[in-house]
Amino acid sequence: MSVREISVNELDTILARGGVVIDVREPDEFQEGHVKGAISIPLGTVPDTVEAFRRPTPVYVICASGGRSMRACEFLHSAGVTNVVNVAGGTLGFAALGSELETGNEA
């Protein structure tokens, strides 16, 4: 089974419905700007935080452009967490649409 993927165009609708977004970029990248409400779990810590992704509803994983988030999704999928969805285009694509980003440590 392959990892599900959505475009940044779909993310606003998902956020409006209360979707959970996990940002796997490094802390300094997250602080510079992230999707409103996103939870920061850097890619290097994903293997130690698998349980944070086990939720009854889909978890949308984002990074800068979609590469690191896809790696995180593939790892999680292989670890049995199948409700993860990659956000293709990432934070850069989301911002390019004119969508607002938050800054600071935690959403």
Predicted regions and their residues:
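Rhodanese-like catalytic fold shared by cysteine-dependent sulfurtransferases
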Residues: 1-20, 26-58, 67-107
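Short, surface-exposed ligand- or partner-binding patches at beta-edge/loop junctions that are enriched
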Residues: 62
